[in-house]
């Protein structure tokens, strides 16, 4: 079993991506762990982040997490997410953040300066200074938000990564609901 696990881990760590991801974070969604095949390595994202995938598959399947990671909708709140988007500079970040909030695709966008992203692009390891947008919005707005980012972003492959909000201040989450479109 140890050699089988070692072989699988080596395959995952040594695998190449089928497309480059530009950005600060490469996140494995717990919702897609069960879809990973044990016989083939994950084909996108940060391959080095997936050394524990075989261990997580048995303990943390999407069925085990599906009820616990989704925030329950109440009369005052809706299922909500945090979305990470990287931008090349402050000007691009402000422009994109303003358009997202103006279109009511998000209640709030934080602009975090001074991040360093290391990634592979066109066969070469690159390193760039970027800024990170932390976007708080409704789960139901992920698709239109992603379309908006893709249409208004300078990158060929902009990073758009969503994480569920599993809880928080009821007043803040109510404000998030009321500040975004239905």
UniProtKB/Swiss-Prot annotation:
One of its GO terms (molecular function) is copper ion binding. InterPro entries: Ion_tolerance_CutA, N-reg_PII-like_a/b, N-reg_PII/ATP_PRibTrfase_C. Pfam families: CutA1. The keyword Chloroplast applies. Keywords: Chloroplast, Copper, Metal-binding, Plastid, Transit peptide. Its main location: plastid. The keyword Transit peptide applies. Transmembrane segments: none annotated. GO terms for cellular component: chloroplast; chloroplast intermembrane space. Residues 1-70 form a transit peptide. Homotetramer. A central prokaryotic signal-sequence-like domain may be used to export the protein to the chloroplast envelope after import into the stroma. Belongs to the CutA family. Knockout lines indicate that CUTA is not essential for copper tolerance or accumulation. This is Protein CutA, chloroplastic. The gene is CUTA.
